[in-house]
């Protein structure tokens, strides 16, 4: 069976950081082990410290080169030279470095386990809903098949049955119809619940990612503090360590915690900011032309489902308009706007957009089938290229990949470090680095696009847009009718240079 979690960008982000955290934890434990053994070997210092320096060097070979690892390399050299260190140094290391490190690592391990359990629990909800949808679908398909067989039996035997037999079969058909309606509604509700469980899982991943990132920052700061404590004690051991300590002190003075934290974030950076949510679409018995059913009956069964979807689409569209007005009000009035209200409104907008996209994809799929039955041209919709199928035994399943903004930005620079001119540049408001400058190329809108944020352009099919900059995450920056903003690259096609000159 297809795994609905594999291709999720949130999941990849979280797993990447988790692996990075595990490597950092192992490195921290190796450093702590080295310091503990050094404290135990101070009495027989000369021989024991030499062995320990070798072990520290090996530990450094298996970790990423950065400011901290470079400083610890100098610490290893100082161990080789400091053959006359005494027991007082060992006790100081034990009390001021080893004990606090053990406490921090133990606390972090418990927190990471708690975060993993929370992620696993929400992931199981997504998988369970996915499986429930498939199970409910199979049940509905079987019931529909039996219902159709009973329906055809009644239709074909009307003339040969007595009134009593006919009434008996009609009662049976009525019960079958009621059962079918209940199973259909149950399947529809499970399908609609799919997006909420998916959102909850992705939200949990985002929250746990941020928590784990804070733990990694804490671990890096701990290693830096240990180095500083180590430096202070070494400086007390007299002239015999002066030469060695000058080297290690120089290395430690160059330790830049912010640089290592930035390296951590770059190491776990997202290669692509495009996030695609996979959701199952509702498949029905009457859609498959291989299933035995009269054409008119197929149409009569598909139309109520389309009507139901259209009703939900209209409601979701009204909700979206209301949320857009709320976001505009929050943006324009600072008197009642706050970060939490803005975040809550944006979250609701994301949930509503995902629901609306799912409803429209279901509606497009059914409308295409109905158009084939009525021998009409198939409808056009941007989601047509996002709907896929896979086969499982005697059934085929439809699912849609919906592109959504990735809310977790793993590669962020401090705003205080950015020049004031950059912060006011409209093209820098959307995350992601630029792939190329547009050089004022032109492109033509293939589909209508409704802006969801203030920095986005509204597009109508056929609009000619001037491209100023192309972003690597699938969004371009350009201008239309004097207004500048972002728009999705998938909704336009570039025009050749000659067309632009014409």
From Swiss-Prot:
<dbReference type="InterPro" id="IPR035656">
    <property type="entry name" value="Nostrin_SH3"/>
</dbReference>
<dbReference type="InterPro" id="IPR001060">
    <property type="entry name" value="FCH_dom"/>
</dbReference>
<keyword id="KW-0728">SH3 domain</keyword>
<feature type="region of interest" description="Disordered">
    <location>
        <begin position="413"/>
        <end position="437"/>
    </location>
</feature>
<dbReference type="InterPro" id="IPR036028">
    <property type="entry name" value="SH3-like_dom_sf"/>
</dbReference>
<keyword id="KW-0254">Endocytosis</keyword>
<dbReference type="GO" id="GO:0006897">
    <property type="term" value="P:endocytosis"/>
</dbReference>
<dbReference type="InterPro" id="IPR027267">
    <property type="entry name" value="AH/BAR_dom_sf"/>
</dbReference>
<comment type="subunit">
    <text>Homotrimer. Interacts with DAB2. Interacts with NOS3, WASL and CAV1. Interacts (via SH3 domain) with DNM2; this interaction allows the recruitment of NOS3 to dynamin-positive structures.</text>
</comment>
<dbReference type="GO" id="GO:0005886">
    <property type="term" value="C:plasma membrane"/>
</dbReference>
<feature type="domain" description="SH3">
    <location>
        <begin position="438"/>
        <end position="497"/>
    </location>
</feature>
<dbReference type="Pfam" id="PF00611">
    <property type="entry name" value="FCH"/>
</dbReference>
<keyword id="KW-0175">Coiled coil</keyword>
<dbReference type="InterPro" id="IPR031160">
    <property type="entry name" value="F_BAR"/>
</dbReference>
<protein>
    <recommendedName>
        <fullName>Nostrin</fullName>
    </recommendedName>
</protein>
<keyword id="KW-0539">Nucleus</keyword>
<feature type="coiled-coil region">
    <location>
        <begin position="160"/>
        <end position="230"/>
    </location>
</feature>
<feature type="compositionally biased region" description="Low complexity">
    <location>
        <begin position="423"/>
        <end position="437"/>
    </location>
</feature>
<keyword id="KW-0206">Cytoskeleton</keyword>
<dbReference type="GO" id="GO:0031410">
    <property type="term" value="C:cytoplasmic vesicle"/>
</dbReference>
<feature type="modified residue" description="Phosphoserine">
    <location>
        <position position="114"/>
    </location>
</feature>
<dbReference type="GO" id="GO:0045892">
    <property type="term" value="P:negative regulation of DNA-templated transcription"/>
</dbReference>
<comment type="function">
    <text>Multivalent adapter protein which may decrease NOS3 activity by inducing its translocation away from the plasma membrane.</text>
</comment>
<dbReference type="GO" id="GO:0005856">
    <property type="term" value="C:cytoskeleton"/>
</dbReference>
<dbReference type="GO" id="GO:0003677">
    <property type="term" value="F:DNA binding"/>
</dbReference>
<dbReference type="GO" id="GO:0005634">
    <property type="term" value="C:nucleus"/>
</dbReference>
<feature type="domain" description="REM-1">
    <location>
        <begin position="292"/>
        <end position="372"/>
    </location>
</feature>
<dbReference type="InterPro" id="IPR011072">
    <property type="entry name" value="HR1_rho-bd"/>
</dbReference>
<feature type="domain" description="F-BAR">
    <location>
        <begin position="1"/>
        <end position="260"/>
    </location>
</feature>
<dbReference type="Pfam" id="PF14604">
    <property type="entry name" value="SH3_9"/>
</dbReference>
<dbReference type="GO" id="GO:0007165">
    <property type="term" value="P:signal transduction"/>
</dbReference>
<keyword id="KW-0597">Phosphoprotein</keyword>
<keyword id="KW-1003">Cell membrane</keyword>
<dbReference type="InterPro" id="IPR001452">
    <property type="entry name" value="SH3_domain"/>
</dbReference>
<keyword id="KW-0968">Cytoplasmic vesicle</keyword>
<keyword id="KW-0963">Cytoplasm</keyword>
<keyword id="KW-0472">Membrane</keyword>
<feature type="coiled-coil region">
    <location>
        <begin position="305"/>
        <end position="335"/>
    </location>
</feature>
<feature type="modified residue" description="Phosphoserine">
    <location>
        <position position="479"/>
    </location>
</feature>
């Amino acid at each position: 069976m297809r795994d609905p979690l594999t291709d999720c960008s949130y999941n990849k982000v979280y797993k990447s950081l988790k692996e990075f955290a595990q490597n950092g934890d192992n490195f921290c434990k190796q450093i702590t082990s080295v310091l503990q053994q050094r404290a135990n070997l101070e009495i027989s210092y000369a021989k024991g410290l030499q062995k320990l320096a070798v072990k520290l060097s090996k530990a450094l070979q298996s970790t990423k080169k950065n400011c901290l690892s470079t400083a610890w390399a100098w610490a290893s050299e100082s161990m080789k030279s400091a053959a006359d260190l005494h027991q007082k140094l060992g006790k100081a290391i034990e009390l001021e470095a080893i004990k606090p490190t053990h406490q921090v690592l133990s606390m972090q391990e418990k927190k990471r386990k708690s975060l993993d359990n929370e992620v696993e629990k929400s992931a199981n909800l997504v998988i369970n809903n996915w499986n429930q949808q498939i199970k409910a679908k199979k049940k509905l398909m079987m019931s529909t098949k039996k219902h159709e067989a009973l329906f055809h039996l009644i239709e074909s035997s009307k003339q040969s049955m007595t009134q009593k037999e006919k009434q008996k079969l009609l009662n049976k058909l009525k019960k079958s119809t009621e059962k079918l309606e209940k199973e259909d509604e149950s399947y529809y509700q499970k399908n609609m619940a799919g997006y909420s469980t998916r959102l909850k899982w992705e939200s949990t991943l985002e929250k746990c990612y941020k928590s784990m990132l804070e733990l990694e920052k804490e671990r890096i700061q701990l290693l830096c503090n240990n180095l500083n404590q180590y430096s202070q004690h070494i400086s007390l051991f007299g002239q015999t360590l002066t030469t060695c300590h000058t080297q290690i002190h120089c290395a430690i003075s160059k330790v830049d915690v912010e640089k290592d934290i930035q390296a951590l974030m770059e190491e776990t950076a997202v290669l692509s900011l495009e996030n695609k949510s996979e959701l199952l679409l509702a498949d029905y018995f009457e859609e498959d032309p291989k299933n035995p059913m009269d054409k008119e009956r197929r149409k009569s069964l598909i139309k109520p489902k389309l009507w139901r979807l259209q009703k939900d689409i209209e409601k979701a569209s009204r909700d979206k308009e209301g949320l857009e007005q709320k976001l505009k009000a929050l943006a324009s009035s600072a008197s009642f706007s706050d970060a939490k209200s803005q975040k809550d409104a944006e979250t609701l907008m994301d949930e509503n957009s995902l629901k609306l996209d799912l409803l429209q994809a279901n509606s497009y799929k059914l409308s295409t089938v109905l158009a084939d039955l009525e021998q009409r041209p198939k409808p056009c919709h941007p989601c047509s290229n996002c709907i896929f199928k896979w086969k499982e035994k005697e059934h085929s399943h439809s699912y849609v990949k919906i592109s959504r903004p990735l809310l977790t930005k793993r590669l962020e620079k401090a705003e205080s470090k950015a020049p004031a001119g950059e912060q006011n540049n409209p093209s820098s408001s959307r995350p992601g680095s630029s792939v190329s400058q547009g050089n004022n190329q032109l492109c033509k809108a293939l589909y209508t696009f409704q802006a969801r944020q203030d920095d986005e352009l509204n597009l109508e099919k056929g609009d000619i847009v001037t491209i100023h900059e192309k972003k690597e995450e699938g969004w371009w920056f350009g201008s239309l009718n004097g207004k500048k903003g972002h728009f999705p690259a998938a909704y336009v096609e570039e025009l050749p240079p000659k067309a632009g000159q014409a």
